[in-house]
């Protein structure tokens, strides 16, 4: 290995400074985010599919179909961006207006631009008007997509949507592609090169998301931490509407708990509450730096618990596992819980675990050290020289599996970014998923990273051809 951290046999491979800087920029610079919001059956998912040029989003906004918000990679006119499909829910007049407004509210915080889809045939509804009022105050570029415009009469229907106060409606047909190119031209022109919302909010109190499945004790814990007993907490999620964030002092330090309004609103009996909870959870995680995922220790781990944990890891946020209702856990349950953790959460052994009771206050003070540990790991950077020395020793002791009769080698390694720690490996061949997991384990053993996901990106380089004779 040379003084600059590269390995001596690297000269035979196509790897220059531009390769490294381009890879770092691609990994560390999050693309801008475009959120697609609107009522059920207005064509949101059809529009997303049209933007992507492939059929990926679920297109059935029918009763009983609920799902999470989903993000997709997209590109238009050379501009890469992420499309957030806010999905569908169970349509019901009782909760519809609130749910559409909820989409708009989350999009305002988590997107760089918003496409608001309205059915031009139906016209503006009360739910559309409520969402439009929110979007007017967002300060974000908002594009009004008047969908289902297939003829000149439809153009007139689209023009009527000026009444929403969001500027000129863009008449489109998501089904047939009419007008979508013009809409995307306008959207891309308004986008920043790099997302201004991903990981935004540097400085000030560290941002914490308190998330978990419904009725796991989030409101009780928030009240316990804040000393605020204004909220009446029952066996169903809910209370009154509070400001979006809560500043809470713990151990003499201010913490910003994001999106606490979602914890203080009674949604347990509302139509579409599963969708509402999913949108709120995604929004809180996106706005946070670290997430406390609350799990009911008195009950078996559920698919919902694992889904929330996956959201945190996929978003690249620091993580603290808090097992609540510990006052209800007896010896038998502790034994079963340990087995469940070993079997179902084996990939999250790096997350600090705190056993608490929001009801009695048991061990809640231990959350602060766990949060600080997770955030310190999340912020960690490893020098390039130290990293390459580490990988050279690891590969010498345990080389990657042979593929196609050839032994892949790691030419160079660098940490592209922190928050979360993201590493780029330039190699001579593909590294199997199992070997990547091995490298992650060894990285954790050597450098810690307790409480933070880490990411490993592999870039395979081509060998240079024979040099031309002079």
From Swiss-Prot:
**Residues that bind GTP 2:** 212-219, 259-263, 324-327
Domain spans labelled EngA-type G? 32-195, 206-379
Which Pfam families does the entry mention? KH_dom-like (PF14714), MMR_HSR1 (PF01926)
Q: What are the KH-like domain coordinates in residue numbering?
A: 380-462
Coiled-coil blocks: none
Q: Superkingdom, according to UniProt?
A: Bacteria
Q: Which residues are recorded as binding GTP 1?
A: 38-45, 85-89, 147-150
| GO MF term set | ATP hydrolysis activity; GTP binding; ribosome binding
Q: Which UniProt keywords are present, listed alphabetically?
A: GTP-binding, Nucleotide-binding, Repeat, Ribosome biogenesis
Is the keyword Isomerase assigned to this protein? no
* Residues that span the membrane, as ranges: none
GO BP, one example? ribosome biogenesis
Q: Which PROSITE patterns match?
A: G_ENGA
Function in brief: GTPase that plays an essential role in the late steps of ribosome biogenesis.
Q: Subunit comment for this entry?
A: Associates with the 50S ribosomal subunit.
User: What PANTHER family has UniProt attached to this entry?
Assistant: GTPASE DER
UniProt similarity note:
Belongs to the TRAFAC class TrmE-Era-EngA-EngB-Septin-like GTPase superfamily. EngA (Der) GTPase family.
- Put simply, this protein is called GTPase Der
The organism is Mycolicibacterium vanbaalenii (strain DSM 7251 / JCM 13017 / BCRC 16820 / KCTC 9966 / NRRL B-24157 / PYR-1)
């Amino acid at each position: 290995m040379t003084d600059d951290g590269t390995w001596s046999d690297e000269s035979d491979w196509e790897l220059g400074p531009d390769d490294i800087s381009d890879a770092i920029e691609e990994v560390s610079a999050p693309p801008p985010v475009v959120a697609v919001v609107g009522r059920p059956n207005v064509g949101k998912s059809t529009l997303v599919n049209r933007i992507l040029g492939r059929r990926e989003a679920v297109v059935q906004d029918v009763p009983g179909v609920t799902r999470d918000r989903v993000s997709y990679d997209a590109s238009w006119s050379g501009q890469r961006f992420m499309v957030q499909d806010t999905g569908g829910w169970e349509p019901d007049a009782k909760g519809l207006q609130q749910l559409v407004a909820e989409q708009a509210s989350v999009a305002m915080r988590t997107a760089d631009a918003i496409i608001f889809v309205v059915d031009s045939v139906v016209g503006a509804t009360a739910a559309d008007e409520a969402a439009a009022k929110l979007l007017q105050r967002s300060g974000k570029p908002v594009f009004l997509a008047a969908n289902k415009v297939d003829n000149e009469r439809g153009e007139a229907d689209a023009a009527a949507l000026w009444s929403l106060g969001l500027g000129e409606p863009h008449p489109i047909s998501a089904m047939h592609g009419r007008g979508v190119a013009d809409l995307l031209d306008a959207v891309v022109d308004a986008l920043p090169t790099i997302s201004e919302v991903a990981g935004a909010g540097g400085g000030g109190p560290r941002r914490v998301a308190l998330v978990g499945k419904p009725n796991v004790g989030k409101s009780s814990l928030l009240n316990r931490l804040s000393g605020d007993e204004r909220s009446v907490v029952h066996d169903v999620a809910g209370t009154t509407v509070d400001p979006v964030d809560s500043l809470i002092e713990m151990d003499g330090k201010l913490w910003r708990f994001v999106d606490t309004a979602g914890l203080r609103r009674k949604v347990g009996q509302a139509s579409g509450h599963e969708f509402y909870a999913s949108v709120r959870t995604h929004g809180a995680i996106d706005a946070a730096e670290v997430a406390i995922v609350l799990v009911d220790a008195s009950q078996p781990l559920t698919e919902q618990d694992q889904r929330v944990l996956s959201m945190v890891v996929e978003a690249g946020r620091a993580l603290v596992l808090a097992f609540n209702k510990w006052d209800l856990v007896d010896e038998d349950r502790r034994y079963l819980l340990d087995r469940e953790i070993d079997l179902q959460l084996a990939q999250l052994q790096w997350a600090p675990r705190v056993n608490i009771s929001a009801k009695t206050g048991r061990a809640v003070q231990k959350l602060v050290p766990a949060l600080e540990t997770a955030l310190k790991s999340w912020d960690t950077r490893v020098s390039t020289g130290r990293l390459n020395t580490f990988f050279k020793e690891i590969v010498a002791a345990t080389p990657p599996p042979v593929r196609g009769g050839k032994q892949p080698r790691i030419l160079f390694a660098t940490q592209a970014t922190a928050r979360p720690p993201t590493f780029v490996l330039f190699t001579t061949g593909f590294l199997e998923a199992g070997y990547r997991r091995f490298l992650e384990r060894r990285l954790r053993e050597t450098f810690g990273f307790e409480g933070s996901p880490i990411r490993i990106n592999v870039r395979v380089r081509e060998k240079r051809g024979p040099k031309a004779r002079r």
